[in-house]
């Protein structure tokens, strides 16, 4: 049989024709599928825009709230429960619903936007125990302005929720995270210090904030340190909280006695503190004591703890690598226990004693709690209080007034009970 006869026989064979047809169809489908994939990749790269936001980014929680507001009709939700316990013991619980992990479609700016929330089950934040997440926005077109508008709107929504409130931050790992609910701003007038003390500190802070160019022109590091010292309960921390409210600043709380705090971590945290915030280091005497004291004079409660060294703290406050545009407040009950190197100018630029209540302070506090009473009654209360006790703290006086909220006469009559 010749070759031409063999080929002719194959053409006449129905089984061979059917098989060849199937191979052809399969090949065509495979080519079409690959072409569709390549075409989709080309289309997504050139005619679609994507924005990915990881959970560690500061805007992540802003965007979750924004998605919740715009994806009102989604039926796939996750809940975030928060509660706050009042001093009376009553617990207020709040449930916040967010779109669950998965795909959601949102109509925004006259276009459809696909929102994909992904939760990584294999990875989690070691400090909070929460899984790592990300949110990806996908939209048609090549205009980035849509995503800028979304981020700006999410930011404004978050700031509106914090408007008129003081946000507290605490150090979690290598970053600052909000601590609890934003608090209502405390009026500066609600903290009564000795005459002229509050004004001196407020004027100094405002002068520092308003003159960054003065520091730059003279080559002076743009940072400011304050030390408030005095007996406990006299209003040091309360004044700092009220000052933050007056300035519209947040507060970053840091404990130097934290065993996980190292030199590098402290330096990093001070460098990445939120803008327009006050860094508060409370009771610095509890972490470090003066090197001039004898070892026998150092109780265990005041020995250095953790991995943070004294030199590391000094370098973080004003070393070569220390950050600028920073306001640091330190408080202590025992200034004599602090090392002179810690409180020298450059690390502490202004030291202020906040002591027991004077006659003027007692008068002002009485008039604030009982505005309907005369100045003579307020003066009489102050004289009686100082005659009974010469070392009254603001916390003790306020606690006494709380027992006689509507009874100023009782507050004066029972002044002897103020320390009981």
Curated annotation (Swiss-Prot):
CDD domains: RecA-like_BCS1. Its EC number is 3.6.1.-. It is a single-pass membrane protein. SUPFAM superfamilies: P-loop containing nucleoside triphosphate hydrolases. It comes from the Eukaryota. InterPro entries: AAA+_ATPase (IPR003593), ATPase_AAA_core (IPR003959), ATPase_AAA_CS (IPR003960), BCS1_N (IPR014851), Mitochondrial_chaperone_BCS1 (IPR050747), P-loop_NTPase (IPR027417). It is an enzyme of class 3 (hydrolase). PROSITE patterns: AAA (PS00674). The chain crosses the membrane at residues 16-32. It is found in: Mitochondrion inner membrane. GO terms for molecular function: ATP binding; ATP hydrolysis activity. Keywords: ATP-binding, Chaperone, Hydrolase, Membrane, Mitochondrion, Mitochondrion inner membrane, Nucleotide-binding, Transmembrane, Transmembrane helix. Residues 33-420 are mitochondrial matrix. GO terms for biological process: anatomical structure morphogenesis; mitochondrial respiratory chain complex III assembly; protein insertion into mitochondrial inner membrane from matrix. Chaperone necessary for the incorporation of Rieske iron-sulfur protein uqcrfs1 into the mitochondrial respiratory chain complex III. Belongs to the AAA ATPase family. BCS1 subfamily. PANTHER family: BCS1 AAA-TYPE ATPASE (PTHR23070). This is Mitochondrial chaperone BCS1. The lineage of its organism: Eukaryota, Metazoa, Chordata, Craniata, Vertebrata. The gene is bcs1l.
